[in-house]
Design a protein with these regions (language model features):
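STAS-like cytosolic regulatory interaction modules
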Residues: 1-38, 50-110
């Protein structure tokens, strides 16, 4: 799993991309947890595009868990949903493992 928090913009997107691509040399599945990202610039989206191409080329199954800021930019820049998105890390892990997420049972007061 690769997790980022704070901001991903032109100042650090290259570092993010380089780190993510370096992980791709030894994995078959990847979850990119961006749920704690507060600002996500167009350079961050470009990073996800590069990562998507690499994962496709290397047959790496991957999922992204976006924050509100990331989801907003994906809605604008990725209308065809080429970046795979899950609502939570647990959901992403289950999807990559080929399992359905567990049902969470909650007791209801009588």
């Amino acid at each position: 799993m690769l997790a980022a928090r704070g901001e991903i913009d032109a100042a650090n997107a290259g570092t993010f991309t380089d780190y993510a691509l370096a992980q791709c040399t030894r994995i078959r599945r990847l979850v990119v947890d961006l749920s704690a990202v507060e600002f996500f610039g167009i350079a961050g989206f470009s990073s996800l595009q590069v990562l998507s191409e690499r994962c496709t080329d290397d047959s790496i199954a991957w999922q992204t868990v976006p924050s509100t800021a990331v989801r907003r930019l994906l809605r604008i820049c990725d209308p065809t949903a080429t970046v795979p998105v899950c609502d939570a890390v647990d959901d992403a892990l289950c999807r990559l493992a080929g399992r359905r997420p567990s049902l969470e049972l909650v007791t209801k007061p009588r």
